[in-house]
């Protein structure tokens, strides 16, 4: 009887250890890439005016320095009015982001600038104009590509250790009190923008709308299955909080946020 009582706990413990081992094997260790629940503040860029003019002058053949100089009589023809405005020089561009690193090839010392093109005829429906990423090596423009309306540089990484930096870029828009923010992880091999992962909507905050049922939703992005020399898998976890208790986030889902 005593022997049976001793064996029962041992068998139970062995079962528990086996179960724990199975759980550990299925759980993937994760490392934080970025948390969109956090409040973010961006310090003003400190780029000398002469440098700004040099950069913009190499990206755009013609541009304006003041919105007041936009031609109110300008009429864009064709199916792409923003392109027509750029061609006509009816733009008021500004530099909104900057990062140094190796973007087009390993070992390069480069600076990437995010530029809000500011087409004169751009409306709220156009997200107030297109955005571009311009990469310079010293004074030489080596890449000029569309930034898909992204204006914020959230982080710079080299996740697979290939010597090329990736950027986590985001961009947002508010309409009738609802803030929507999207994000993507991109790199620029050989000067071409490549989307590594499009995270879609990472912030949806309707608290400012005052509508019934308003809430805030935000994504947290993790790295999983990280191995040397390989791009890790990316995991999205979504959370929500009420407008009354904005700091009390509750887990909502995994994967891209449902719109």
Model-derived regions: residue spans:
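Sec-dependent N-terminal signal peptides
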Residues: 4-12
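Acidic, small-residue rich beta-repeat scaffolds with periodic aromatic anchors
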Residues: 16-81, 175-259
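Repeat-based blade/solenoid architectures
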Residues: 80-97, 145-154, 202-218
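Short consensus segments that form the blades of beta-propeller domains
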Residues: 88-90, 119-127, 173-178, 211-212
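Hydrophobic/aromatic beta-strand elements that line small-molecule binding cavities or substrate pockets
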Residues: 98-101, 133-134, 154-157, 183-186, ...
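Acidic/hydrophobic-patterned starts of short beta strands in beta-sheet-rich repeat architectures
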Residues: 102-116, 158-173, 223-238
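A glycine-rich, hydrophobic loop/mini-helix early in the fold
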Residues: 108-154
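Long, charged/polar, surface-exposed segments that mediate recognition or autoinhibition
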Residues: 129-133, 140-142, 147, 155-160, ...
């Amino acid at each position: 009887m005593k022997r049976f009582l001793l064996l029962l706990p041992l068998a139970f413990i062995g079962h528990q250890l086996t179960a724990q081992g199975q759980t550990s094997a299925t759980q993937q260790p994760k490392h934080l890439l970025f948390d969109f629940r956090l409040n973010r503040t961006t310090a003003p860029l400190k780029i000398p005016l002469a440098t700004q003019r040099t950069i913009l002058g190499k990206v755009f053949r013609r541009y304006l320095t003041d919105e007041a100089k936009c031609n109110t009589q300008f009429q864009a023809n064709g199916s792409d009015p923003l392109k027509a405005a750029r061609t006509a020089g009816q733009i008021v561009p500004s530099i909104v982001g900057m990062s140094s690193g190796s973007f087009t090839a390993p070992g390069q010392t480069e600076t990437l600038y995010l530029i809000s093109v500011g087409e004169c005829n751009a409306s709220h429906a156009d997200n107030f104009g297109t955005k571009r990423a311009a990469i310079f090596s010293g004074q030489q423009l080596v890449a000029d590509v569309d930034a898909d309306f992204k204006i914020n540089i959230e982080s710079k990484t080299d996740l697979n250790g290939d010597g090329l930096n990736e950027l986590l870029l985001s961009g947002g828009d508010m309409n009738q009190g609802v803030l929507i923010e999207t994000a993507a992880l991109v790199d620029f091999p050989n000067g071409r923008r490549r989307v590594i992962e499009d995270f879609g909507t990472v912030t949806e905050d309707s608290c400012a709308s005052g509508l019934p049922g308003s809430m805030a939703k935000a994504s947290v992005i993790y790295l999983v299955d990280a191995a040397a020399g390989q791009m890790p898998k990316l995991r999205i976890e979504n959370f929500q909080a009420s407008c009354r208790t904005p700091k009390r986030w509750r887990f909502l889902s995994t994967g891209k946020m449902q719109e």
